[in-house]
Amino acid sequence: MPVQGSQRRLLGSLNSTPTATPRLGLAANQTGARCLEVSIPDGLFLSLGLVSLVENVLVVVAIARNRNLHSPMYCFICCLALSDLLVSGSNMLETAVILLLEAGALAARAAVVQQLDNVIDVITCSSMLSSLCFLGAIAVDRYISIFYALRYHSIVTLRRARRVVAAIWVASVLFSTLFIAYCDHAAVLLSLVVFFLAMLVLMAVLYVHMLARACQHAQGIAQLHKRQRPAHQGVGLKGAATLTILLGIFFLCWGPFFLHLTLIVLCPQHPTCSCIFKNFNLFLTLIICNAIIDPLIYAFRSQELRRTLKKVLLCSW
């Protein structure tokens, strides 16, 4: 991933020896000041990655097995699961290689490790970009289904959805390759941050607009049935809570990583920023957690998908 040179983890592990580190402790930065560092045990990181891997594989298999789920909406959900699967898998692979190098179980030249590091970084970066894009695509799809309900099936066709999916994957791989090749340039890191903020604003605007429409719809129904205002307020509160959870999880899981990239550009040598840089693995762990949560929000809430998943699991036994 595009981080500071000292944090290129695979290359650093060639000449490193494993050291015991606490999960939470005070570490000294370059100026000798004390700062909070959260160390994520490799076992915990790999376990979270495995949970995410299994979850998202199940989503992909369930959607692929059920032809009723071969719709544009589930196409985006399936691709989101595939992106999250690659995010988890690439980070697990990197961690496993690091552990093997540190244990001496894997012997490799620096040039080979450099190439492997670049490949893993491209996979990780492209899957992160595609994951953000598919979250935005799902928001746009839901927006069209609400505000253009009568024209939805003519606007969002499976053919167009597949074109969007192909464009997202191609663009993600292309731009991630450029990002990794020029990760030392401030403009590259800032463009990633701007892209994240654009996705955040897009999702917030669309979902807030959808919430407002839902409240208006509930108010109209309440007036038709001559109900009191609390019924309308209940819908608004429930929708606001759902929106807060959805956007809150997105910002909490992705925000720290992009804050990290921003600080690399703004204050690479500042003591406070150096303390934040020490928690890079924590920020990656939060992204893995997002990959675990995404299926719960976007996939497993579907009864049709849950039924298909149950059949798949029963057949596997």
From Swiss-Prot:
InterPro entries in UniProt:
GPCR_Rhodpsn (IPR000276), GPCR_Rhodpsn_7TM (IPR017452), Melcrt_ACTH_rcpt (IPR001671), MSH_rcpt (IPR000761)
What are the alphabetically sorted keywords of the record?
Cell membrane, G-protein coupled receptor, Glycoprotein, Lipoprotein, Membrane, Palmitate, Receptor, Transducer, Transmembrane, Transmembrane helix
List cellular component terms (GO). plasma membrane
Q: What is its main location?
A: membrane
- What are the annotated disulfide bridges? none
Glycosylated positions are: N29
Membrane-protein topology: Multi-pass membrane protein
| Transmembrane stretches, start-end | 38-63, 73-93, 119-140, 164-183, 192-211, 241-266, 280-300
Q: Pfam families, from UniProt?
A: 7tm_1 (PF00001)
Gene3D superfamilies in the record: Rhodopsin 7-helix transmembrane proteins (1.20.1070.10)
Hey, which stretches end up on the Extracellular side? 1-37, 94-118, 184-191, 267-279
Q: What is the annotated quaternary arrangement, including any partners? A: Interacts with MGRN1, but does not undergo MGRN1-mediated ubiquitination; this interaction competes with GNAS-binding and thus inhibits agonist-induced cAMP production. Interacts with OPN3; the interaction results in a decrease in MC1R-mediated cAMP signaling and ultimately a decrease in melanin production in melanocytes.
The UniProt family comment states:
Belongs to the G-protein coupled receptor 1 family.
Q: What does this protein do?
A: Receptor for MSH (alpha, beta and gamma) and ACTH. The activity of this receptor is mediated by G proteins which activate adenylate cyclase. Mediates melanogenesis, the production of eumelanin (black/brown) and phaeomelanin (red/yellow), via regulation of cAMP signaling in melanocytes.
**Name of the protein in its database record:** Melanocyte-stimulating hormone receptor
**Species:** Trachypithecus cristatus (Silvered leaf-monkey)
